[in-house]
Swiss-Prot record:
Taxonomic source organism: Chelativorans sp. (strain BNC1)
Protein name, as recorded: UPF0386 protein Meso_1721
InterPro entries: YjhX_toxin
Family (UniProt): Belongs to the UPF0386 family.
Pfam families documented for this protein: YjhX_toxin (PF09857)
């Protein structure tokens, strides 16, 4: 299964230890989404549509109401990239 460049970018950040933090409104609907790297930087470019696409593919999951992290399925989908650290 191919994934888009934007999905690839998000999954790569999550594979390195980042997370997706979700804030919900009073009705329980998602109000705000932010992707945070392992260093604490907020990554732009994550919108609700992209979040739903990645979640639908089973690449991310939340446990016990915590932030969304990459799953084993997500690790299989993500292609390795060189990291300039």
């Amino acid at each position: 299964m191919d994934i888009s460049r934007a999905e690839q970018r998000i999954l790569h950040i999550l594979a390195q230890g980042g997370c997706i933090q979700v804030e919900k409104d009073e009705d329980g609907r998602i109000a705000e989404i932010s992707c945070v790297t392992r260093d604490g930087w907020h990554l732009p470019g994550l919108d609700l549509a992209l979040f739903r696409k990645v979640k639908r593919k089973g690449a991310i999951a939340s446990t016990n109401g915590g932030p969304y992290r990459i799953t084993r399925r997500g690790l299989q989908l993500v292609r390795s990239q060189t990291d300039n650290r």
